[in-house]
Structure formats: structure tokens, C-alpha cells
Amino acid sequence: MTARRLGRFAIAALAALLAIGATGCMILEMKERELLYRPMRDYARTPADVGLAFEDVWIDVASETGDGRERVHAWWLPSGKPGAPAILYLHGIRWSLGSNLFRIARWRELGFNVLAIDYRGFGRSDGDLPSEMQIYADARAAWHELVRREPHSELRFIYGHSLGAAVALELGATVDDAAGVIAEAGFTSVADLVAESYAPLNLLVSQRFDALERARVLKAPALFIHGTADRFVPPAMSEKLFAVAPQPKKLHMIEGANHGNWNGAGLDDYRRVILEFVASARERVRATRG
């Protein structure tokens, strides 16, 4: 979340407080959702554009009102290799699958089967403006789809970037059949991000994404990754997530990498750390089974 967007939220919050009672709360929450989420309807690029085989997947989810069904769009990118690990890819607060293609392709290059989803309101998924609870529900539904496609728990992993890291930690604290969770460029909570510049407006945040609390109760090994040159999410937040997470866990700071690591800093070490983590997590599941 950029400083400009935080500023817009602060102005919106103060304006909303002028409205009294429930109406004011409703205005504040809706304005917050409008400023926080930046859904993009980007259909232009697909994995085929970078030479990767893929399948369009549609996942049913309950509507926000609970009286109907909506669909979440996903890509399934098979590695074509027997015994390859599978990862659920959860993107950040902006863009859509097409705009995340370069990062999704990295996982395929590492040899993973990849299930990457667009939350409701993003890309080709149904819905307009998502909410925190909807995004969590979308991730859980996508996890069920991954489990259906990959029956072996030692091969199933969860990955999230930025906002997606918070979603990954929530999912990793909920399901008990993931081999590991990888959280990249994660924040401790949206409220903490707001407090960085506009405290005490953090008390008004309804879309909290309290990743710190979810990290405390993770049910799987965790790898936390953060770039030291991240200007959007302080690297210290990943250090805090790491500090509260139960063992086994690992923290890897990428020297010189920005929030999206567009500059490709430390990619060799990035790949090595991920593959070592995955190998260790898989072995741990096997050992647990005896």
C-alpha cells in the first residue's frame, strides 16, 4: 500500500466520521474497500504468451449475501513432471493474473505445478469489490481445488505475495494439510501499515488482514521472504511475522530487492532458498507419517 493510497484512506476516513452511526460505518467500510482493493480486469496475457501450457479453471464460491453462487477464475499450469510439488499462488492487492504472469512463470520454472487465482472482482472472476472475508473464502475454495488435483499432502504448498502473503498465512493457519507456507513481502496487518503514517486512524480499519495473529498459529512450516529495498511494506514486518511463527520456519531477506522484485535482485539465492525449504518440508511430512 503506497503512501498516496494511505493518504486517500485517511481523508476518506475523516469524511466518513462526519456521518454519525451505522450509516457512517457503512460509508467508511465501503470507501476503505474502494481505496484498498485495486481490481483489474486484465485479460490480455495468458501463460501461452510465454510458452507455458495452462488450463482455465472455474471454482464455485458462495455469494456475499449467501443466496447464490459466484465463480473464481484460476489458471492451472502443470509441470508435466511426475512427483512435482504443487503451489497455490495468491497475488497481491493490485493487478490480476495476467499482470502477475512474470512471477507465476517463475514458479513453473522452478518445477512446480501452479494453481493461480484471481479473487472476486479481479480478472475474469465474478463480483465487483471484494472484502477481506470473501478473499479468504476464495483462497479456501482454491485450496480445495488444489487438493483435488494433488492428493499427496507432502506436495502441496501455499504462496502469497504482499496482500497475498496475509491470505496465505490465514489459509496456512486454517488448513492442516499443507506441507508449507511461503509468504513474500508480507505485512503484519493493514492497520499497522496505516499506523506507519496516519496513526491512530488504524483503529478505523475494517479490512484488517491481521497476518501477525495468523502467523502465530500456523499449522505448517513457513518461509518468509522480503526485499531490503521494499518501499511499500517495511521489511521489518516480515521479521515480526517470522518472530511469532512457530517452528519450523525460515527468514530470507533479499538484498536490494524492491516490493515486486522487478529488478530480479538475488534471484539465484531466492530459487535456492525456496527449493531447500520445499525439500525440507516434504521430508518432514514423510517423517511424520513414519
Model-derived features: positions:
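An N-terminal hydrophobic leader/cap segment in hydrolases
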Residues: 20-63
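Membrane-embedded segments
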Residues: 66-145, 149, 172
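Short alpha-helix in the alpha/beta-hydrolase fold that links the catalytic acid
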Residues: 103, 220, 234-243
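Alpha/beta-hydrolase fold nucleophile elbow
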Residues: 150-162
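Hydrolase active-site cap/lid region
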Residues: 165-220, 268
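Short beta-strand/loop motif that positions the catalytic acidic residue
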Residues: 217-219, 224-226, 230
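Acidic catalytic loop of the alpha/beta-hydrolase fold
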Residues: 228-233, 259-261
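Catalytic histidine-centered segment of alpha/beta-hydrolase-like enzymes
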Residues: 257-267
